[in-house]
Amino acid sequence: WPAWPRGPIQAVIHSRVDRGDYTVEKVYFSSLAGHYVTGSLYRPKADRPTSKRRPGILCPHGHWPEGRFYDAGTDKAAEQLKRGAEMFEAGARYPLQARMVQLARMGCVVFHYDMVGYADSRALPHRSGFGDVGAVLRLQNLMGLQTFNSIRALDFLESLPDVDRKRIAVTGASGGGTQTFMLCALDTRPSVAFPAVMVSTGMQGGCVCENCCFLRTGINNITIAALFAPRPMALSGANDWTIDIETKGLPELKAVYGFYGKADLIDAKCYPRFGHNYNQVSRELMYSWMNRHLKLGGKEPIRERDFKPIVPGDLKVFDVEHPQPRDAMTLEQYRVFQTRLIEGQYAKLLSGARKGLKEYRRVVGSAARVLLAGTPSTGYSASGIARGKLSGGGTFETGTVTRTGLGHAIPWTLLTPAKGPGPSLVAWFDGLGKAALFDEQGKPIPAVRRLLDAGHSVLSADVYLTGELTRDGKPVTRVDTHGSFVGYTYGYNLPPLTHRIRDVLTVVSAFTTKLSAAVNGGQGGRIGVHLVGTGGAGTWVVLARAVMSRGRASRGVTIADVGGFSFSKITRRDDPMLLPGALKYGGLGGLAALAAPSVLVLGGTEGVPKSELSPLRRIYDVADGELSIKAGSISADSVAFMILGR
């Protein structure tokens, strides 16, 4: 996000093999400038020339050894024949080719394309190259590239003169099943889908090509597959993680399809006597599904026929006469290309902001809702509340607050002036937690006391991994992540920074509602909220304000000391401040700019790169917002002075 540019396909189709009732051709085309998709194109061969367009089927393969070139060998083939998984030796030894051949014989144009790092697609590796912090901060990953390749494979299929664009289907197994339902969730062109032995409530995908940051936080593959509704989709299961698909997954999918009155257009069948597979038994289930929903007119039941396979060496796309293009990028070149691409996209957003902020807020704001978990609240509950009097005047309350649907409790403290709640709330967060607002005797620090005496309520909390939510009360400097690929961690779990921002939003929203009712008696609108972040909490607070503002000026000032922090300084995958995608959207300043035109004082910026501050200045200038950027740190006394001076 935003989408990558889709340039000319420039497809090369060569070396036609005629098998009598179908043909096979070799294909490569440009997915991105300097990155190529390779594969085999299967076409039905008509008895006589026809102008009739045929259904097109896209077939991604999974993690079979050598992918499109897969040869099970004689021993495994014999085992498959013995177990009844296959009827013919050719299908048992070359099950991927068997699928393409049968679909072509049924009247479909079939494109069987390579995953990155398999068969002819060897310019980039499959399981490495995107695990470093730089890739994480820019959301560069193999999942994104392969999904884009699938979109481009659809572009290629649609470009063929003999393909009916209204009858496009996708089917693949295992990792190819992942590519199938991911593509079908994102692209509206496929009309039929059959992801085999992948969709389940269990394991969600074990390869880096099936995972990326933020992909499955709070959801699973059932949810993603449901995005295809109400178009026809069928699933197959086996004696693997998909074994329960008929009872765990299918009922939920039928419920979603039922919203459209189309529960009959989703189905699943498990064959528990077979291990992980896309064997003839499962393939014939798929053939029937395609026959019915692509309106192929075949006589049921459809049985796969024997065929003459092409030896893997003869499937190779690149040869002496058709060498790999000279501009094919290496991994290092691709990474540079990708970085320049996203930098160019962001620069275009900044440049366009001179004419208005609508597009900037649409693109970066949409990203921020994912990165910063800025979803609307659905309610709150408080518990363990204790009350008492403050030395020097006023009262305190302590307790925990829980956001509906999240479960974890956030410890908080609310200090109220002697005369009761006033028209504004100071929500002050610190890296040490709420304890930072009190001295060693448990009294409010002088800055907090001045705010109370001036009629401001003061709120603080121990957000994620701070204060009471740590083992020893000390700041957490390292968090556990997967050793080589954080997509396995942050694809399912929110980063600590995002948790902290969401906790800030939860606490502020809950008490803004509570105090607004207390001050206004339920009438006259909400109170003003000043947000303060010190002691390492400045980044959490300014990004929380970015989520809260939504293009509107807040009724309070935001004072955030970032302590020299910038996302470009992060070097470790276990850094609790690591936010995947941050540098793709302008870093600290690019995301914080969403707070405009709310009044913002950003301190502790000494050492923060210009590249992460200039977007903030640019957007605030266009929004005509009040922005003050200070190199030095912001003291507690300065916080009180700035709030009381307004």
Question: Where in the sequence are the language-model features?
Answer:
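Catalytic-domain carbohydrate-binding cleft regions of carbohydrate-active enzymes
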Residues: T171-G176, T180-A196, G202-E210, F214, ...
